[in-house]
C-alpha cells in the first residue's frame, strides 16, 4: 500500500465513477481499477460491491475511505512542514476561487502578486463554495478566496475586503434617472438570481427578503454575465457585486445604481485549514491582497459617490 493507492480510493469515493476518478488522478481507468483490486487483496477485504454498474462501497470500504482522507491530510501537513524549511513565499500554491469573485478579482491581484512573490507558483482553481471547502478539507487546495458563509467558519477566515452590491436595471427602467436606490424601494419587486449552489444567490436572496422583494422564478442564471445580459434585454433587475460592475453608470444597456438603507455587501476572505504549518504564508498573502484591494475599493466607492 502506498499514498497513491489511497488517492485512487478517495477519488473513486468522490466521483463514484471509475473513468472520472481515473481522469482526476491523471491515470488510465485500468490502472486505477487494478490498484483498487490490489488494495483489496492486500487488506483482505472487499472495498466495493461488484454486483451493480454503480460504484457502491462496502461498509469496510467506507471506513477505509474516511481513514484514507485522514492520512492524506496528514501527508499534506508533512509536505507543508517541509516546504516551510525553505523560503516562505516560494513553491507551489493551490488557490481556489468562487466564480462570482475569480474573474473580477484575479485581474486586480495577479500582477501584483507576481511582482511581490516571484518565486510563488500559483495554481488557480474555480468552483462553487461547497466544492472549494471540500477540496480545502481534503488537502487538494491550500487556501481559497470566497465570500464568508456559515460553512467556512470551520476554517481559519482572514477577511480581505467588503464588497458592496449594486442594483442592475435596464437603461429604460423608471429608476434609471436616480442616483441611488433605497433597499425599501425593492419591496414587491422580483429579482433575477443565480442558480442554486452559488453563495451569492443566498446572500442576495437574504437582502431581497429583508427588503420585501422576492425572486423571479422564471429564470435562474449560471453566471453573472448571463444575469447581466438578461437585465440588458429588459427581462428583469438584479443585484451584482461591485467588482463585476463597470466604472460607467450605464453600459451596454444596463444601468448600475448604488443601494443604501442598508448597503448590501458581502465579505470576501481568504480561508485555510486550522493548524496548517503554512499559516505565515497564507497570512502574508492575505495582507498583500487586503492592502491592494483596500485602495481599489476606495476608488470604486469614490466613483460611486
Curated annotation (Swiss-Prot):
- SUPFAM superfamilies (alphabetical): Periplasmic binding protein-like II, Winged helix' DNA-binding domain
Q: Which UniProt keywords apply?
A: Activator, DNA-binding, Transcription, Transcription regulation
Q: Which GO terms describe its molecular function?
A: DNA binding; DNA-binding transcription factor activity
Recorded hits in InterPro entries, A to Z, give:
LysR_subst-bd (IPR005119), Tscrpt_reg_HTH_LysR (IPR000847), WH-like_DNA-bd_sf (IPR036388), WH_DNA-bd_sf (IPR036390)
Q: Name one GO cellular component term.
A: protein-DNA complex
Top-level lineage group: Bacteria
The keyword Amino-acid biosynthesis appears for this protein: no
| DNA-binding stretch(es), residue numbering of this chain | 18-37
Q: Where is the HTH lysR-type domain?
A: 1-58
Q: Which Pfam families match?
A: HTH_1, LysR_substrate
Function, as annotated, reads: Required for the induction of a regulon of hydrogen peroxide inducible genes such as catalase and glutathione-reductase.
Q: Which family does it belong to?
A: Belongs to the LysR transcriptional regulatory family.
What is the name attached to this protein's record?
Hydrogen peroxide-inducible genes activator
**What is the native source organism of this protein?**
Dickeya chrysanthemi
Amino acid at each position: 500500500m502506498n499514498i497513491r493507492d489511497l488517492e485512487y480510493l478517495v477519488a473513486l469515493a468522490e466521483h463514484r465513477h471509475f473513468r472520472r476518478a481515473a481522469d482526476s488522478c491523471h491515470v488510465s481507468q485500468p490502472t486505477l481499477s487494478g490498484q483498487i483490486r490490489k488494495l483489496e487483496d492486500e487488506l483482505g477485504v472487499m472495498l466495493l460491491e461488484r454486483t451493480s454498474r454503480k460504484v457502491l462501497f462496502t461498509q469496510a470500504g467506507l471506513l477505509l475511505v474516511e481513514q484514507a482522507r485522514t492520512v492524506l491530510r496528514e501527508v499534506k501537513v508533512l509536505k507543508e512542514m517541509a516546504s516551510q524549511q525553505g523560503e516562505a513565499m516560494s513553491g507551489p500554491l493551490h488557490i481556489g476561487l468562487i466564480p462570482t469573485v475569480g474573474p473580477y478579482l484575479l485581474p486586480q491581484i495577479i500582477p501584483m502578486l507576481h511582482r511581490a512573490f516571484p518565486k510563488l507558483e500559483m495554481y488557480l482553481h474555480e468552483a462553487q463554495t461547497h466544492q472549494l471547502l471540500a477540496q480545502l478539507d481534503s488537502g487538494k487546495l491550500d487556501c481559497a478566496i470566497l465570500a464568508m458563509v456559515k460553512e467556512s467558519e470551520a476554517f481559519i477566515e482572514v477577511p480581505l475586503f467588503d464588497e458592496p452590491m449594486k442594483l442592475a436595471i435596464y437603461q429604460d427602467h423608471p429608476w434609471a434617472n436616480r442616483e441611488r436606490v433605497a433597499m425599501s424601494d425593492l419591496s414587491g419587486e422580483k429579482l433575477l438570481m443565480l442558480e442554486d449552489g452559488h453563495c451569492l444567490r443566498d446572500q442576495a436572496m437574504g437582502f431581497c427578503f429583508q427588503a420585501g422583494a422576492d425572486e423571479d422564478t422564471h429564470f435562474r442564471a449560471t453566471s453573472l454575465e448571463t444575469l447581466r445580459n438578461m437585465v440588458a434585454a429588459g427581462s428583469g433587475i438584479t443585484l451584482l457585486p461591485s467588482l463585476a460592475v463597470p466604472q460607467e453608470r450605464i453600459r451596454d444597456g444596463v444601468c448600475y445604481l448604488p443601494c443604501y438603507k442598508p448597503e448590501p455587501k458581502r465579505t470576501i476572505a481568504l480561508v485555510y485549514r486550522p493548524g496548517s504549518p503554512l499559516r505565515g504564508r497564507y497570512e502574508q498573502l492575505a495582507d498583500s491582497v487586503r492592502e491592494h484591494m483596500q485602495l481599489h475599493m476606495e476608488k470604486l466607492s469614490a466613483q460611486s459617490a
